[in-house]
C-alpha cells in the first residue's frame, strides 16, 4: 500500500471518528430564547410573588430552598405531603402545603445521606417562568436561601459566572398555578 493511500485511510478514519462529536455539539447549542443572567439574581417564587435572591448553579442538578418548619405527613394511604414556610427578602412568610413528588438522597460533607422532600414550585428569573423541582433544605449556613439548578436553567438561562444581577426582564405574575 502506498504512503498516500495509508494517509488517506487514516484521514478518513479520523473524520468518521470526529463526526458524531461535531453533530452532538450542534444538538447542544442553546436555544435562541435563552437569556444570559449572572450567577446571582433576584427571582420570584410561587404565584404569590415572593421575592428572593438566588444563586444560579449549573453544577447542581436540582434546585434547593431554605424551608422553615418542614413537616412531612401522609394523606390517604400512600400520598406524602409536606407543610413548610418560605421567607422572602422582605421578611414576608408564606405557608405551603404541597404534594411531595419524590424524596432526594443528598450526600453530606461527612459522607452520610440526608433524605429531603422534593416539590414543584413556579419560579421566575429574568422574565423566564417555569416549574422547578425543589428540595426543601436547611440552607441556614449558606449565603443564599435558594439555589437554582440545571433542571430549571436548561434551555432557559445561560449563566455568566463572572457577573451578578444582570437580569433585564422583570417577572410578571403568572395567570395560573
Label each region the model flagged.
Residues 1-11:
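Bacterial N-terminal signal peptides that target proteins for export
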Residues 9-19:
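Bacterial N-terminal signal peptides
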Amino acid at each position: 500500500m502506498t504512503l498516500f493511500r495509508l494517509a488517506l485511510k487514516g484521514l478518513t478514519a479520523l473524520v468518521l471518528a470526529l463526526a458524531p462529536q461535531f453533530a452532538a455539539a450542534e444538538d447542544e447549542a442553546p436555544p435562541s430564547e435563552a437569556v444570559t443572567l449572572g450567577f446571582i439574581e433576584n427571582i420570584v417564587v410561587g404565584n404569590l410573588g415572593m421575592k428572593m435572591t438566588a444563586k444560579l448553579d449549573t453544577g447542581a442538578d436540582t434546585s434547593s430552598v431554605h424551608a422553615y418548619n418542614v413537616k412531612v405527613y401522609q394523606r390517604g394511604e400512600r400520598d406524602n405531603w409536606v407543610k413548610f414556610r418560605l421567607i422572602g427578602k422582605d421578611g414576608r412568610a408564606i405557608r405551603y402545603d404541597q404534594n411531595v413528588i419524590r424524596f432526594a438522597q443528598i450526600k453530606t460533607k461527612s459522607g452520610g445521606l440526608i433524605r429531603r422532600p422534593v416539590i414543584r414550585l413556579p419560579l421566575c428569573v429574568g422574565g423566564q417562568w417555569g416549574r422547578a423541582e425543589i428540595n426543601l433544605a436547611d440552607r441556614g449556613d449558606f449565603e443564599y436561601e435558594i439555589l437554582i439548578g440545571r433542571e430549571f436553567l436548561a434551555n432557559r438561562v445561560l449563566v455568566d459566572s463572572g457577573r451578578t444581577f444582570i437580569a433585564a426582564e422583570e417577572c410578571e405574575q403568572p395567570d395560573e398555578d
